[in-house]
Structure formats: C-alpha cells, structure tokens
C-alpha cells in the first residue's frame, strides 16, 4: 500500500547550503520532518552545482514523517542576471536598461530549464525567457 501524503512544502534553497535555520527549519518542523536528514540529503544532491545558486525544491511529506523531494531548475531571473553579469534587474525596466543578453545565452538558459518550461520547442522557450529578460530591464540582442 502506498504511503499517505500529508503535505507538500515548496522552498527555494541555495545549492549546498541547506541548514536548519529559517526558512528551512520552521517549514519542515511544522510537518514533523527530520530537518537534519533533509539538509544532508539536499546538500549531497546539490554539491555539484554552483554554490549559492538558488534551487527550488518541492518536498513531499508522508504520514509516517518520511519525505521525498524533487529539485527544480534555478529561476530564470537568476540565470539571466548571471548571463548579463548584473547584480539585480532594473527598477524601471521600460526606460532604464541595465544589461544585454544574446540569443545564444537565451538558448543556453532554455536548454538548462527545458524540464521546467512548458514551451513546446526551443523557439517558444527562447521567447518566454526573452520576455522575462525584458521585464528585468535587459536588452535582448539577436
């Protein structure tokens, strides 16, 4: 018989830096999950990634207090900022541009995020990510 699911927890944790302090500890503690066990498992799975890269994770908690988790790809905004070499997006994206990204960079981001994007093909994914880039005040170069 399958285990009964008691809840889902969605968090965004820096790669290799999960620790019991907020926001991780309280979120897991509410559901009775062993916090250190999750932190060790998450850090082990993300040690190959760039340290500090935010990784969205969905934790499924079962009635016997066990858990499984699924890692997602880093947010598009983080990848765009990294590609453009900027610290943050523009406060006024329509008037104040803060950087540039090329189509090749967008294609690399789409290739990385392919599993989490709903786009039908690479071209649609590029358009989606290009829209995110423009919303952040980045200029998209063809």
Curated annotation (Swiss-Prot):
The record's annotation in InterPro entries points to:
Ribosomal_uL11, Ribosomal_uL11_bac-typ, Ribosomal_uL11_C, Ribosomal_uL11_C_sf, Ribosomal_uL11_N, Ribosomal_uL11_N_sf
Domain of life where this protein originates: Bacteria
* Annotated GO CC locations: cytosolic large ribosomal subunit
Q: Does the keyword Ligase apply?
A: no
Q: Per the record's keyword annotation, is rRNA-binding included, yes or no?
A: yes
Q: What keywords would UniProt list here? A: Methylation, Ribonucleoprotein, Ribosomal protein, RNA-binding, rRNA-binding
Q: What molecular function terms (GO) are annotated for this protein?
A: large ribosomal subunit rRNA binding; structural constituent of ribosome
Give the multimer and partner information.
Answer: Part of the ribosomal stalk of the 50S ribosomal subunit. Interacts with L10 and the large rRNA to form the base of the stalk. L10 forms an elongated spine to which L12 dimers bind in a sequential fashion forming a multimeric L10(L12)X complex.
Q: What does this protein do?
A: Forms part of the ribosomal stalk which helps the ribosome interact with GTP-bound translation factors.
Q: What is this protein called?
A: Large ribosomal subunit protein uL11
Protein's organism: Dichelobacter nodosus (strain VCS1703A)
Instruction: Give the gene symbol.
Output: rplK
